[in-house]
Amino acid sequence: THRLMIGVDIMKDFGASPVSPERAPEGSAETDRRLSNLNLFRELTLYYSLDRQMGKTGLSVTAGIFPRRMAEGNYSRAFFSDSLRFYDNNLEGLLVKVSRPKANFEIGCDWMGQYGTFRRERFMIFSSGEGKVASMLSLGYSAYLYHYSCSETAGGVVDNVLINPYLKFDFAHMVDFQILSLRL
């Protein structure tokens, strides 16, 4: 299945609206007109998606600016903070997912900043996978590389690598629950 999607990302912080200039001191951030409901549109979403089933193997490829929720890997909060998930809820890049009856894997790239005079080059390559090796046991991992590079005015490069392998014991079938598992 081929899809071409276009939309807009709308965001409103509950309770965030401008205060009347008569009620706040001059220069207060709370009087900023950008807090009004006229400035809800944050980002254009535009992406191409391909979903294909080849025997028992499913393949999904998404490219463009698309919702972060499309990345379905089992990532710790150490990888993606709540504020990143909420305030930067779109990925700008590529996501490839492969699924089998007893395993699933994904790899993606989020391009967060293009090199410029004052803007640093930033991107994140992330991956997650899990495979069932026995009825109660799965092996999995999540990993990322975060690249934070220089700009024309600031030098230096930082590359952070985070890898989280795990064992997962699934007890749900023993007690008739949808989910009951232990990750080590």
Stretches with model-predicted labels:
Residues 1, 38-44, 88-92, 119-125, ...:
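Residues that define the transmembrane beta-barrel architecture of outer-membrane proteins
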Residues 1, 46-52, 94-98, 127-131, ...:
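Residues on the lipid-exposed face of transmembrane beta-strands in outer-membrane beta-barrel proteins
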Residues 1-54:
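Beta-barrel outer-membrane channel/assembly domains of diderm bacteria
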Residues 2-4, 53-58, 102, 130-140, ...:
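Short loop/turn motifs that connect adjacent beta-strands in outer-membrane beta-barrel proteins
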Residues 142-184:
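Long, charge-rich C-terminal accessory regions
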